[in-house]
Amino acid sequence: MTTIYLNLILAFTLALSGVLIYRSHLLSTLLCLEGMMLSLFILMALTISHFHMFSLSMAPLILLVFSACEAGVGLALLVKTSNAHGNDHVQSLNLLQC
């Protein structure tokens, strides 16, 4: 394995550990999730270009679209939570009832 792949796997692992460690605030959890999605996007794009699998060339873009949707929903939830409760603690999410 080359050092680029190892660095990307390390970045994914660090972002995953960030989700597990900094799970008290919603904003820090969303940032760690975005780091995970970015490392997955780069890893997928490099793997597809390295193995010349051009039939799968749309897969990184689809992952990027899902990442953008996840970020939009997460930020909307962050705004709703902070307007309703005045903080961005993950424990406040249980209080959101429609």
Swiss-Prot record:
It catalyses: a ubiquinone + NADH + 5 H(+)(in) = a ubiquinol + NAD(+) + 4 H(+)(out). GO terms for cellular component: mitochondrial inner membrane; respiratory chain complex I. It is a multi-pass membrane protein. It comes from the Eukaryota. InterPro entries: NADH_UbQ_OxRdtase_chain4L/K, NUOK/Mnh_C1-like. Keywords: Electron transport, Membrane, Mitochondrion, Mitochondrion inner membrane, NAD, Respiratory chain, Translocase, Transmembrane, Transmembrane helix, Transport, Ubiquinone. It is found in: Mitochondrion inner membrane. Pfam families: Oxidored_q2. Belongs to the complex I subunit 4L family. PANTHER family: NADH-UBIQUINONE OXIDOREDUCTASE CHAIN 4L (PTHR11434:SF0), NADH-UBIQUINONE OXIDOREDUCTASE SUBUNIT ND4L (PTHR11434). Core subunit of the mitochondrial membrane respiratory chain NADH dehydrogenase (Complex I) which catalyzes electron transfer from NADH through the respiratory chain, using ubiquinone as an electron acceptor. Part of the enzyme membrane arm which is embedded in the lipid bilayer and involved in proton translocation. This is NADH-ubiquinone oxidoreductase chain 4L. It comes from Rhyncholestes raphanurus. The lineage of its organism: Eukaryota, Metazoa, Chordata, Craniata, Vertebrata. The gene is MT-ND4L.
